[in-house]
Amino acid sequence: MISKVIKDKIDIDKILIVTFTNAAASEMRERILDAIYKQIDENPEDEALQKQIILLNKASICTIHSFCLDVIRNHFYELDIPANFRVGDTGEIELLKQDVIEELFEEKYLNNDKEFIKLINTYTNYRDDESLKELIITIYKFIQSSPFPKEWIEEKVKMFKIDDITDDFSGTIWGKILLESLSEDVKDCIIRLENLAKEMKKFDELEKYIKVIQNDTYELQSLLNNLNTWDSAYNHSNIEWMKWPVDRKVTIELKDEAKKIRDDIKKKISSSINKVLLYNSEAANNDIKEMYSILNSLKNLILEFSDRFKYKKREKNIIDFNDIEHFALELLVKKDDKGNLISTEIANEYKEKFEEIAIDEYQDSNLVQEYILRSISKGNNIFMVGDVKQSIYKFRQARPELFLEKYEKYSIDKEQGRDLKIKLFKNFRSRQNILDFTNLVFDNIMTKEIGDILYDKDEYLNLGANYEPPENIKSVYAGITNLEIIDLKEDDDDEEENDSSKSIEKNESDEPIVL
């Protein structure tokens, strides 16, 4: 973005730079200011650069919440909120939530609300109702990361609605997920059995044991072939395991190892079947139908809490951090006649204002923020910076998949004339040995299934700084990755603690671990 100001001559107040923290915003301002001053030193007559010093004071370099708050303050009259609204502090907001939930529960008790009493019987331990209160507030907080919380929760609860309990359960999303999970377990065990049989065939003495393994494979393959429908899977879920032969004359070590592997497979399959295929379709559908009734009541209670909480905030002229994003979304996004999301007139004003939009730490954005920033962009003027490996805010409903979707879709080829991806793989903070170790670990543990990204040589970190060669450093650790394992687990056993201390002392005196 600095080059946009200096090289492309874009006024700094025509650029929106969204950072994750206020500190990052301040740092960005300083970096831009330093870069401008450096250019002025080289080109003291450049009036355009001097102009940027003045414009920097009103430049939009801020967090997403600061930007949204600015949108709200400039258009509060569209939201039916007073001009003197304020953002409530965390403690005040939490106390208000507790007041609202207490009042709501008290009213439900007084009215002997049947749906409410059913929820009490389902989610509490009969001593108090705190667990249900906590559940309502937790779900309420969770759905605020959705652009449209009410629609989201109604859609999710509707997934539990069963129209005909006689339909095969595999037709539901729940049945599909469970059968897919069981199928993966069965496939894994079949591969293990086939590999085991291949090894055992090297020994003629293991022929009768091989027959058992082959029978196991046949039984599991039969189950796998019947996992296309629920009732078919249920009817074939009784695996007939052959008895393992006992022959003391066979002393080959692989025999005992094979039995251990087989026992582990039997345990895994039995556990998977008992977790998944508990009932036939009708019974499973009945369970989901009963769950729908309960979840629908829970949804209604959450939405009622949401409405009351919103009313209480209006009474006190306060908004919270979730309101900041949702009010901005309300001002910037609307649905057309076909239900498609489009930019409002207010959003179009911001489109005209900003020539470029830059988003830092994009991997930690949520869907509300995505809709907001997309609504004010021209479509091809957003610059996103992120690293999915640094995504640590999923518990706050960050959506790293937004980053991954673009990472997979965008091209590194400028000539293709479409959305461009620039890979930043040079690391300026670490020496080569640290990078080698990091690449080694990530290469082995990060896959599409675990970590959402395939960490291969195209993703490796590369040395970017010029460090002094290890041979010139007078240290035993030069060029070596020293791996220190710190066990923070508390242990009440004094004897074990003493043993652990001795072990740590020994490790500290040993040579570093070379990797």
Language-model segment annotations:
Residues 110, 371-374, 390-391, 447, ...:
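AAA+ P-loop NTPase catalytic core and its hallmark functional loops
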Residues 56-69, 121-145, 298-304, 319-332, ...:
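Core structural elements
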Residues 1-80, 312, 316-322, 330, ...:
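P-loop NTPase Walker
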Residues 8-13, 37-58, 75-92, 103-118, ...:
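Short, polar/flexible loop-turn hinges at active-site or ligand-entry regions and domain interfaces
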Residues 1, 27-35, 67-74, 96-104, ...:
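Alpha-helical scaffold elements adjacent to nucleotide-binding pockets in ATP/GTP-utilizing enzyme cores
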